[in-house]
């Protein structure tokens, strides 16, 4: 028990130890003001009930943890977060990883077909390859895919969750979000946001996709689609951005239409990173910019 007025804490701990396994259980309450404790310089206080259980078996590389927060409340510089219940669970052995987060109408799930040690090893192998993207301005998708660990991540949320509360403090929000990321034989990501709002502007639908395709040279394709219903941002009734990353080349093509189907933009560009130079070219020869047709110089 701690009775500091800025760190009120009462915890009960129990557990067991044996050569084969360890178990632990913890319950209690925590009420703390990190700003008053001078650990941070901005408003940050947390109050919650806590229940934690853990299991470790080193011989079988088996680990399990369940964390449950009740009557959780947090005051942050830009927002206040509150929920009756937040649960985090994870378990792994030498063959798999499972993890989940639940709170309100928010759900996140993560799975992998390899154990935690192998997962971390592959992540460490991928870091140098990711670093070379910045250093050499080149994406080696084949090499990256070979070292990325296999996994699946799924997340969805509506209006009653901590994400919404956090975004509200920044004058942002949405009605529903779905995100799926998978790395198996190929990397694939899809996402959709309904009624995304920021700064008084609302976009009815945002759809994102990111996927790997094996051709002459492995490419990472991306696509962003914006759609708005009649009466909302009619000049941006439809916006589609498509492109890919491959080696030292990236390509982007944009088509924007108004409610009447007129094209406000139809233009693409390709950027080639050559040592210390960036070579940029535009297409097609007669792009549409600002609802008018233009002619590009041959150079």
Task: List each language-model region with its residue ranges.
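Surface-exposed, low-complexity/disordered segments
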Residues: 140-144
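Hydrophobic lipid-interacting interfaces of membrane-associated proteins
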Residues: 1-22, 27-61, 66-121, 128-137, ...
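A short, polar/charged loop/turn motif at coil->beta-strand junctions and beta-hairpin connectors
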Residues: 147-149
